[in-house]
């Protein structure tokens, strides 16, 4: 989406990775409350989908910013997970011959993914950031909203979701999809910054 279209549609400028890093650093400067509700422990780093590769390529800078502010960092990339999970299944060879049947196993994959992420979150401390990347790879398979809602209660510190899409008035749209969802996560950048 061009910057002009972005401005017209969402009333703001398309941000650079440097802008996102600055917004992330600003969020890190806010003291964490231990009694924060689950939704408040979820940070949505949202950006134009055209920036996905740049954000992923510079994730190390976000990690460095977190570590410089005294926070721990854990990272999990969702992008390869469906392929790895399907390849381990006993029915993989049959599914390869009839890929149209893969839709029937998506609830099993979602349950597996939720359990895997929760197990990884259990290794985190209340001062850690768990960065969940590759959310765009779920598009068409699973709903990001369902996944995030299912794991939010297990987050001891903060969950940073890299989110290629849009945010306006509490509504998030992954990859500019028509249907968005209302979620009380902390947007980075915040509405006030943009």
What are these model-derived regions, one by one?
Residues 49-54, 81-82, 106-112, 136-140, ...:
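Short acidic, S/G/P-rich loop/turn micro-motifs used as interaction or catalytic elements
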Residues 72-116:
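Long, charge-dense
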Residues 40-44, 129, 158-160:
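Residue-level preference for the first positions of well-ordered beta-strands
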